[in-house]
Swiss-Prot record:
UniProt organism field: Synechococcus elongatus (strain ATCC 33912 / PCC 7942 / FACHB-805)
This protein's encoding gene: cyd
Cofactors that this protein relies on: pyridoxal 5'-phosphate
Induction: Present in when grown in sulfur-containing media, induced 42-fold after 48 hours of sulfur starvation (at protein level).
Enzyme Commission (EC) number: 2.8.1.7
Activity-regulation annotation: Encapsulated enzyme is 7-fold more active than encapsulated enzyme.
Catalysed conversion reaction: (sulfur carrier)-H + L-cysteine = (sulfur carrier)-SH + L-alanine
Coarse class of the protein's main subcellular location: other
Protein name, UniProt field: Cysteine desulfurase
Amino acid sequence: MTNTVPSVPAVPNLPTQSDPFFNERSLEQLTQTVLQDLQQAGVSEAESAPTPLSVPTPALPTTSALAVPQSPTAIANVPAPPSSIDERSLAQLAQAVLQDPQLASAIASIFPSVTLPTSASVPRSVPVPPSFLPSLVPTAPPIHDEVGVIPHHQLPVPSQPTPAGLQQTASSKSGSGFYFIDEQVETAIAALHSNLTVFPQLTTSSIPTLTGAHSAGAVGFDIHQVRRDFPILQERVNGRPLVWFDNAATTQKPQVVIDRLSHYYQHENSNIHRAAHELAARSTDAYEAAREQVRHFLNAASTEEVVFVRGTTEAINLVAKSWGSQNLKEGDEIVITWLEHHANIVPWQQLSAETGARLRVVPVDDYGQVRLDEYQKLLSDRTKIVSFTQVSNALGTITPAKEIIELAHRYGAKVLLDGAQSVSHLAVDVQALDCDWFVFSGHKVFGPTGIGVLYGKQELLDATLPWQSGGNMIADVTFEKTVYQPAPARFEAGTGNIADAVGLGAALEYVQKIGLEAIAAYEHELLVHGTALLSQIPGLRLIGTAPHKAAVLSFVLEGFSPEAIGQALNREGIAVRAGHHCAQPILRRFGLETTVRPSLAFYNTFEELETLAAAIRRIQTGSLAL
């Protein structure tokens, strides 16, 4: 039976159905906004206490039913109800209602005709865990031989939920489900299904059951809690909510990193290793604690193998200018791949010009995968160093790093692994990989800019002369001779970037608390969903379709320049990179000069991907002007 819904008096600043983001708003976002407006209006808990009603034919409340003062700012910015909602949004709201009585009260005070379940009224099959509890992350899905790589084809999703609901367990880690959903939350979802007449655009038939494309797999974190950890995600760009899809360029920073930097400057700021006062001790302790955090993150054998640098670019240059200059000569060979960022090409070109060594390049196939057969043909006794990326910044391809390293070592070559694009997506174990050097930048893994890491095997670092000279890296200086400190100090000349090293330590600790296995599983599903959405757009060509890839969705759209697409998306609040991504050789391998590159992180959502796809479709059909 169709219910008759009365009209609602006009409320200032409510979005209309013509708003491009109208269909992208989840119920969770709606209720969060309502709660914020209640708090801004100064409504007490008593005023907003729920009054459960059982009305056979619920109707929309009039403005007089709103438990807030009637002023233009009291309920401003409340988004209009969406015209469709997916299983994920409904499950998130149901879980939030059960876990947050304040949120339930806010919903009930605004929409009194909705009867919300409470945790006390629902039979409990298992306790509802906290919304953010990384320690309960289930066992990871099957993993490819490469460390931390989860292949697309190894994450099956059954067509129906299990009889016990959607609770994830270590013994059943491939089921459909939403994080920690159990029977209690399932009952709440059913209650929400039966009360949707307060949203006139919604019908129970328009809401899918708890199966489908948005299964969360073995994910063990609450995406909305994660997003609340990143203040910048609340920003608006051109009047739209910020959608940050430029994560391959840089990642956003969680509040814990911002707070750690602030604490350092307020309570610990000093130079390190060279004073007897209290602040110097605090600063030194914080700096060296960050080094230990990096060691733990990479599973290095010792903190003496961890060198702080400005970033990946400086780390590669350090190896090329120090170890390379000491060990390469005319006739020797350096091997890189077509996938490399310019920062892993130019230093080796310069070294080749200086020493007479030859630069060899491993080709890739039409999917963007390294040709291992061709790589083996390039290796010989002349090969002195192989330097390659673990994840392509332009295509997202995950290279078979362990195999590449093992083959190089058979010929006595050293190996540098560029982890700039891998550390935020995959668990890295430098001892298991057996790489000689591993490099990455802090800002790519939710840390500050201007700080990075060079990991090197201790025997290599000890045998390498420093690239730069100055204070902090010497043991003794006379006019006749200088004795250098052992590694890592010998490579950290001058006053280092102390505060940002401390901030990097906080970022890595944050990532490890969530768990890179959980992050990889969630991002895998984002990538699958995004690939499916973009593949359906007429004229769109995805660039880089390797079966093992990280969260990059480079594409071109027939008839439109990448730069124009990037500008149009920016007007919709969507940040992507449009250009050559400092990787011109690999784009030219595909006959291109530039692409549009959406790149994902674990704070992105399925709804954001749908917003992106909808905007691209509007560009393609001409309804979104360039």
